[in-house]
Amino acid sequence: MFHNTFQSGLLSVLYSIGSKPLQIWDTQIKNGHVKRITDEEIQSLVLEIMGNNISTAFISCPVDPEKTLGIKLPFFVMVVKNMNKYFSFEVQIIDDKKIKRRFRASNYQSATRVKPFICTMPMRMDEGWNQIQFNLSDFVKRAYGTNYVETLRIQIHANCRIRRVYFADRLYTEDELPAEFKLYLPIRGQLSTQSPAFAMTSE
């Protein structure tokens, strides 16, 4: 999708305020919903994904399972709200050995598990709105000893509210971000920054 796009800085793949936030996303929902609502805390439109079973309620990008994103930027960032329910997301990448690997982070897992084609890890979230930062290059190297080449697919499961999902060439401070990438929290004033925990355990 983005193979022929010049990639630097910030590359947004979902923005809840946009005219068609799910234009490049496929929606799979059973016993749940994906809808745009106004979040009372930030008084702004957000995308809510809710479902009784997280495995049957998710959005994925790109829409066509045969196509890939082709995003080379190494930082994956999501601005999401903790709904105090099970929540997970998955990023599929390809490394310099031409092997596809999946990284799945969830708030209901306690240990990191690395298998040849999938790495699952726990993720802690604060109350309210969180900024989840995922250094794909670092995780690929630590889990598999290979180098990150590009991201192929993203899947975001219930249960959460999403403000924005984007890729970046590096981590940006709040002051460096363009205004439309910032989330203004009237109550706390500061967005909680999280990263999936990569703590290896021997099993």
Curated annotation (Swiss-Prot):
Protein name (record): Cilia- and flagella-associated protein 20
Keywords: Cell projection, Cilium, Cytoplasm, Cytoskeleton, Microtubule, Nucleus
Protein's GO biological process: cilium assembly; positive regulation of cell motility; positive regulation of feeding behavior; regulation of cilium beat frequency involved in ciliary motility
InterPro entries in alphabetical order: CFA20/CFAP20DC (IPR040441), CFA20_dom (IPR007714)
Organism (species): Caenorhabditis briggsae
Presence of the UniProt keyword Transport in the record: no
UniProt entry tagged with the keyword Transit peptide: no
Role description: Cilium- and flagellum-specific protein that plays a role in axonemal structure organization and motility. Microtubule inner protein (MIP) part of the dynein-decorated doublet microtubules (DMTs) in cilia axoneme, which is required for motile cilia beating. Involved in the regulation of the size and morphology of cilia. Required for axonemal microtubules polyglutamylation.
PANTHER family the record matches: ORF PROTEIN (PTHR12458)
Chief site of localization: nucleus
